Amino acid sequence: MSMYSLSIAGLLATTLLLGACGSGNSSPIVIGGDTGTPVEPETPVQPETPVEPEVDKRLSGGDTTVFSESSSAFETPAPNLEGERLDKHLAGDVAFEDVFVTAPAPVNSGLGTIFNNSSCIRCHPRDGRGRAAEPGVDQESIFLRVSIGNDPLTGPEPAPGFGLQFQHRAVFGVEPEGKVDVAYEELETTFADGDTISLRKPVFTIVESYQPLPPGLLTGARVAPPVFGRGLLEAIPEATILGWADELDDDNDGISGRTNRVVDPISGATRLGRFGLKANAVSLEVQNAGAYHEDMGVTSSIFPVESSFGQTQYDELLDEAEVSDETIENVTFYVQTLGVPARRDVDDSEVLRGEALFTEVRCAACHIPQARTGDFPAVPEVANQLIFPFTDLLLHDMGEGLADNRPDFLASGSEWRTPPLWGIGLTAVVQGRNEFLHDGRARSLMEAIMWHGGEAEESRELVRAMPAADRDALLAFLQSL
């Protein structure tokens, strides 16, 4: 029985045993007897107002939350999976780790001919972030998007001889497109109290390209982001995201988040983009098929043409799809049903103070703390959940410091989709290091904050003006996520 329900039996018992109030007579009231004792009117019982249950801020992913602070925190199944649904998740887990090899082969055949990596897990180790670029080495989980222009309706225009992604590896006997190298500049910035911090600025260079780079080549570096929680983000109703948008800054708060509208390669329709660092993918299915296609050179029914089409590396064999629809479906379900790590230390006074500061300096204007998912029949485990992702899934101008100057559909060269912050405090535990932002340049959360510009410049300057104790509290809050 609910704590808010009245017991009928108890109410009757109470009525039978109550004495006459204010009469000085302790004799029981008799109901329906012959004694002639008057029956006193029953005092109306006012129903209690139900109390809304207190929100448990630990439950970042609602019913999909996992209570793990280990290195496996990002790769744990949602706890509300069971039976055949859990089996399907585990099948997707196997496919996520499968390594593709050069054709012909009995399994996982069709790698390349040019590619960046050979499996999902190598770009997303432990289902988390990839590694930032390192000078003078073969890059493992960072790549360059390339193009020579952009049509807001149809998207980036492929670079002749290089397509839409620079692929630095190739199968035996085939020439890769070249190599990517990086150098870092250290830029010192100072807080109002005199403390300093060094910001690492990457400068990427294409070397040993197999042919001359085309004039006007646009490039943008991408480090693979974490993959957990994406099913919940996919289940946020489009109306909710549109309600967060404020493209013309009608409320005059300096924040003008807007949506990206991109072509769905399955239907051909233009739809809301919500995945990818510039919100250029309409669904997880499309994003995953795109990763097979561009990152691994593996074709599918969604992207049936080799990524090297029109180049000297093109494989002219008329192969069937190299990854099956079933595998794409299983990998998509796997990503949709990964659990979200629980928040920690939610009642700690320092964390609570940092949470208040997070709102006060208006970080929460873009990193919206909570959302509710809608109906999602394909994956009911993520439907109708109160979640705490800290994102609005919108594009925001982040200023020239973070700009790659490569537009993508409606996204300008300085706009980025707000990344979710859930789980960010466990990054070092899972990945063994801290590297943040779209290209992994930030080695700490404070570095990431101080790179914010554009719409976030005012918030950054408010953080700069904080005393060290307040900055520490802000970081304590972020570490609790």
Language-model segments: which ranges?
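Bacterial N-terminal signal peptides that target proteins for export
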Residues: M1-G10
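PRPP-associated nucleotide enzymes
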Residues: A13
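C-terminal motif of bacterial Sec signal peptides marking the signal peptidase cleavage site
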Residues: L18-A20
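Periplasmic c-type cytochrome electron-transfer domains
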Residues: G22-L481
